[in-house]
Amino acid sequence: MKILEIKNLCKVYGSGDTKVDALKNVSFDIEQGEFVAIIGPSGSGKSTLLHILGGVDTPSSGEVIISGTDISKLNETKLAIFRRRQIGLIYQFYNLIPILNVEENMTLPILLDGKKPDKKLLRDLVNKLGLKERVTHLPNQLSGGQQQRVSIGRALMNHPALLLADEPTGNLDSENSKEIIALLRKFNRENKQTVIIITHDERIALSADRVITIEDGKITKDSGRRGLSA
């Protein structure tokens, strides 16, 4: 089942002499349960693409269809609701709230949506992420790897259709990087969680089911599906 369809996606910044074509007629689709790495040099358009997929930015033209909804047609309010309920975002810098503990950071998006957190899911995530002894700790009491685990848990609390990660290991050492990717793979395999990662790290790309290369705003290579996670 297609979880994501991108059709003739374009993104233009500025106009006239300052015009920049960040994305140029990008088209591809992703099946539910895929683990996809998007790679490319700095300025290639890969982060712009991820921001559009995450509903953080809007396209100049084209379609972005997630779970049957074309988010490019949504107004700002509906897009914010869709993003909160259907998309999990993980960044290089963890973006945790300093005055909230681990549990509070993980459940904040659910509370902002006016819902009660799923306590069973919270316990399950805390255990799988190795944070059981850290639930009352503040971000400044955690290591970088632990903070990124919290951000992963926060992103998964809403059962997202898509889990999007922008350089999730870029601020971590090699050992913590391996652990974070292993965790993302674990959720991908066990829960059929669709994962898209923007990365410069070739080791991460090699661990993906599929690698899409972007250069100068265009897809220049797509490895194709090497088989969905079982």
How would you describe each model-predicted region?
Residues 2-214:
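ABC family nucleotide-binding domain
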Residues 218-230:
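Conserved beta-strand-loop-alpha-helix hinge in the C-terminal portion
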